[in-house]
Amino acid sequence: MVSLQAVQQANVGIGSLPAGLVALFMGATSGIGQSALHHFAQHASSPRIYSIARPSAVRSHETFLDSLRSSNPSGTYNLIEADVSLISEIDRIVADIKENEPKIDILFMSAGFMAFEGRKDTREGLDPSMSTRYYSRLRLVQQLVPLLNNAPSPRVVSVLGGGLESPLNEQDLDLRDPKNWTFWSSSMHSGTMGTLTLERIARANPNLSIVHWFPGTVATPGLVRANQFGMSPPNPTSADEAGQRWAFIATNDRYAVRGGLVPVPIGLSPVQKSGGGIFLVDPAGEGSNNERVLAGLRKRGVDDAVWRFTEGIFASAAKAGRSSQAKDEL
């Protein structure tokens, strides 16, 4: 396990990295994401930060960004208002980023929730608990690959269930049949499909370091909701510690396909990639081996099937978005 002390000591080195790192955060309005953004901004030199907030969270998140402006006035903090359960909104976000930045150094994604109340599809016909945890995340990475590849040591960190992948319902990947959908199955499908598709992106972009991190149980607003539905995991990690650990994972060469960021702490060794080419990281900051599940999925071509299916979802969402826009203009 990587001790919190080692994490904190290493994170001081973030301040020695080149000034002007560009970081995009999706899911930083509360919980792990907000803590991660806080700790990154605390250490980074003149960072250029973009943070996405859903409409209902804009006011509170702007207040939070104001606190970062006060604590590190050398940075630039930009709020992007968007509903990330919609693929069309992701495309708009990417278009805005591309107009303002030639590169992205760090992409952080933790948006999402467990739909304890049941499935309620978006206007694009998707389960929002899956779109925030899978479709929108993949779309964001996919569309930002050119900007990520323009950075010297790009890093993507998706916070969900790296190392916890499980068999998929291959006949109903988006769990559209009500008999197949539960809040748990939607979570497991999101995590497993996320790993398989991120591996595909990593294989096509060998200089891009991609981490799928399972942070364990963390004391966040999401955990409060889980408690209301009878789920009470013991001994949760504080959001503050989780944010510090994310800053370590996002900037340390321990989780890199090549060096260029903060050196690996003395006494620790680089984490090994999964068989598919990404870093699956557990709550202790160590590599997680789940080849027992993943190797079989790859061997049978399930990763390719998931990719093709997801491309179809993106095409359908784009069509639904255009149809909705046309109706709004009538």
From Swiss-Prot:
<feature type="glycosylation site" description="N-linked (GlcNAc...) asparagine">
    <location>
        <position position="207"/>
    </location>
</feature>
<feature type="binding site">
    <location>
        <begin position="12"/>
        <end position="17"/>
    </location>
    <ligand>
        <name>NADP(+)</name>
    </ligand>
</feature>
<protein>
    <recommendedName>
        <fullName>NmrA-like family domain-containing oxidoreductase notO</fullName>
        <ecNumber>1.-.-.-</ecNumber>
    </recommendedName>
</protein>
<dbReference type="InterPro" id="IPR002347">
    <property type="entry name" value="SDR_fam"/>
</dbReference>
<comment type="similarity">
    <text>Belongs to the NmrA-type oxidoreductase family.</text>
</comment>
<feature type="binding site">
    <location>
        <begin position="59"/>
        <end position="60"/>
    </location>
    <ligand>
        <name>NADP(+)</name>
    </ligand>
</feature>
<feature type="transmembrane region" description="Helical">
    <location>
        <begin position="12"/>
        <end position="32"/>
    </location>
</feature>
<comment type="function">
    <text>NmrA-like family domain-containing oxidoreductase; part of the gene cluster that mediates the biosynthesis of notoamide, a fungal indole alkaloid that belongs to a family of natural products containing a characteristic bicyclo[2.2.2]diazaoctane core. The first step of notoamide biosynthesis involves coupling of L-proline and L-tryptophan by the bimodular NRPS notE, to produce cyclo-L-tryptophan-L-proline called brevianamide F.</text>
</comment>
<dbReference type="GO" id="GO:0009820">
    <property type="term" value="P:alkaloid metabolic process"/>
</dbReference>
<dbReference type="InterPro" id="IPR036291">
    <property type="entry name" value="NAD(P)-bd_dom_sf"/>
</dbReference>
<feature type="binding site">
    <location>
        <begin position="38"/>
        <end position="42"/>
    </location>
    <ligand>
        <name>NADP(+)</name>
    </ligand>
</feature>
<dbReference type="GO" id="GO:0016020">
    <property type="term" value="C:membrane"/>
</dbReference>
<feature type="region of interest" description="Interaction with ASS1">
    <location>
        <begin position="158"/>
        <end position="202"/>
    </location>
</feature>
<dbReference type="InterPro" id="IPR052228">
    <property type="entry name" value="Sec_Metab_Biosynth_Oxidored"/>
</dbReference>
<keyword id="KW-1133">Transmembrane helix</keyword>
<dbReference type="GO" id="GO:0016491">
    <property type="term" value="F:oxidoreductase activity"/>
</dbReference>
<keyword id="KW-0472">Membrane</keyword>
<keyword id="KW-0812">Transmembrane</keyword>
<keyword id="KW-0521">NADP</keyword>
<feature type="glycosylation site" description="N-linked (GlcNAc...) asparagine">
    <location>
        <position position="180"/>
    </location>
</feature>
<feature type="binding site">
    <location>
        <begin position="160"/>
        <end position="163"/>
    </location>
    <ligand>
        <name>NADP(+)</name>
    </ligand>
</feature>
<keyword id="KW-0325">Glycoprotein</keyword>
<keyword id="KW-0017">Alkaloid metabolism</keyword>
<dbReference type="Pfam" id="PF00106">
    <property type="entry name" value="adh_short"/>
</dbReference>
<keyword id="KW-0560">Oxidoreductase</keyword>
<feature type="binding site">
    <location>
        <begin position="80"/>
        <end position="82"/>
    </location>
    <ligand>
        <name>NADP(+)</name>
    </ligand>
</feature>
